[in-house]
Swiss-Prot record:
Keywords: Nucleus, Phosphoprotein. It holds the Pfam family FAM124. This is Protein FAM124B. The modification Phosphoserine is found at S49. Residues 323-334 have a biased composition (Low complexity). The keyword Nucleus applies. Interacts with CHD7 and CHD8. PANTHER family: FAM124 DOMAIN-CONTAINING PROTEIN-RELATED, PROTEIN FAM124B. It comes from Bos taurus (Bovine). It comes from the Eukaryota.
């Protein structure tokens, strides 16, 4: 018995307006059923409210669609099959892609004498080609601007963890799935100099990755978590990318907690090719959070900038994606996009309380498996960041470990003397001292009396 190949590492998500998801999903399934019945590459999700896209006039530079899907079908499998696919593309809801732009000028020569179709102006364009030999191919092509082509090859090779199967001066492709009769390819095509890319806002490429912590610092744009296992970013030309983390407790992911807690990391964090250990990753996050504290990175999962620089939003910050099956997924939860590092500085007991409370609220969070379209749990608003901490931390009181860390009469006496000396200080000094006690005495062994006196003298200096 022949072993079935592993599922492809890439999935294409298409975002449809409310009420159109089921129709578009059925249309794609019927089209691809005779080509690749074993895999479901295209998944349609619905938005809760329609989105308006504002196109800018580009009089000096021609615009080219950022994504296309080409079907290479063999002639010897029957003309009826080929005619059936072509006939399906010529009926509603398919629309013929115009060969001229708004100014009446023809599109670049790449589309010359070729017919393309689309389900929406913000979805990929589709085309059919005949092949005489070899396997049938479904090729998802990303068109890259002239200057970004080489960088795009390195980016997708890093995400896919493989080299390009074939690479030429202006074209390359990766084989993501193959059988004896069918192959799935992701290809990159370099556009002529002076041609800009028009990214499709309703199209998202999702890739399965094993680790997100070592990948995030090497991405060209900020990467933000939009759910427990999914992170969103974009490539050099503005195409949306989803990174789906394969949870594995052996890789440092505990209770679904992402190993990288800062969602606004960019390519300037680490040099290309560097690797991080958990300790160095935490230190890097702390240093970067200090550097960008005054900088305002306002990146959401559905608000991405146009090539012209003006952000185009797919909706409000509370826009929900709803799959064709009727379930919903938050596309840009504002409270999820900014994970915090404060739990790293708590003593073990307090951190367990924080994680326990976070996990209890995560059970109420709506998480939709976009691969199946089913909502895993019910949706409830997440609590504020301050409410996640124990009450003793909310009121700036030291944790309970301080009351039990001192034992014996000598320790009690030193504690009374210490409190008497601290009492006349202003409130700010008391708050700072409390913070020192939390950081120094809880997670570390109890210091000797000499060290405690040195700490007191240093504090008063």
């Amino acid at each position: 018995m022949d072993e079935m190949p592993e599922p492809p590492a890439m999935t294409v998500h298409l975002l449809a307006n409310a009420g159109q998801g089921l129709l578009l999903q059925q249309t794609l399934d019927q089209l691809l059923d005779c080509i690749c019945p074993d895999i479901r590459l295209f998944l349609v999700s619905e938005r809760a409210s329609p989105v308006k896209y504002y196109d800018k006039c580009h009089s000096k530079r021609s615009r080219f669609p950022g994504m296309s899907v080409l079907l290479f079908l063999k002639e010897n499998l029957g003309e009826e099959r080929l005619f059936h696919v072509l006939d399906s593309l010529q009926h509603w809801p398919w629309q013929c892609y115009p060969t001229q732009n708004a100014q009446g000028r023809p599109c670049p020569y790449i589309l010359a004498n070729q017919e393309f179709y689309s389900l929406d102006s913000q979805m990929p364009i589709w085309g059919v080609r005949q092949v005489h030999c070899g396997t049938e191919i479904l090729r998802v092509t990303l068109y890259c601007s002239f200057d970004n082509y080489e960088d795009a090859i390195r980016l997708y090779a890093m995400i896919l963890q493989r080299e390009a199967t074939l690479q030429k001066s202006n074209f390359c492709f990766f084989v993501l799935y193959s059988t004896e009769t069918f192959a799935l390819q992701l290809s990159l095509k370099q556009l002529p100099l002076g041609t800009s890319v028009d990214p499709k806002e309703a199209s998202v490429l999702q890739f399965k990755v094993q680790e997100i912590g070592q990948l995030v610092p090497l991405l060209p744009h900020p990467c933000v978590p939009i759910s427990r296992t999914r992170w969103q970013t974009q490539d050099y030309d503005g195409n949306k990318i989803l990174l789906q983390v394969q949870l594995n407790p052996g890789l440092g992911v505990r209770n679904g907690e992402p190993p990288f807690l800062n969602g606004t990391l960019g390519a300037d964090t680490l040099p290309h090719g560097s690797r991080l250990t958990p300790v160095s990753a935490i230190r890097t996050l702390e240093l970067r959070s200090r550097r960008i504290r005054g900088r305002r990175f306002k990146v959401s999962s559905v608000e991405l900038p146009e090539p012209g620089g003006r952000p185009v939003s797919d909706g409000s910050s509370n826009t929900w994606w709803k799959s064709a099956g009727g379930s919903a997924q938050p596309s840009s939860p504002a409270t999820e996009s900014q994970p915090q590092l404060s739990s790293l500085h708590l003593e073990p007991g307090a951190r367990m309380k924080v994680l326990g409370r976070e996990n209890s609220f995560e059970k109420l969070e709506a998480e939709t498996n976009v691969d199946t379209g089913f909502t895993m749990v019910s949706s409830e608003p997440r609590p504020s960041f301050a409410s996640r901490f124990p009450r003793n931390l909310q009121t700036h009181q030291p944790p309970s470990c301080l009351s039990t860390s001192f034992s014996g009469s000598a320790a009690s006496k030193n504690n009374r003397i210490f409190k008497e000396r601290v009492h006349p200080l202003p409130l700010a000094g008391q708050r700072d001292l409390g913070a020192k006690k939390i950081l120094s005495k809880c997670p570390l062994p109890l210091p000797v009396q000499g060290e405690a006196k040195e700490a007191e003298e240093e504090f008063f200096i």
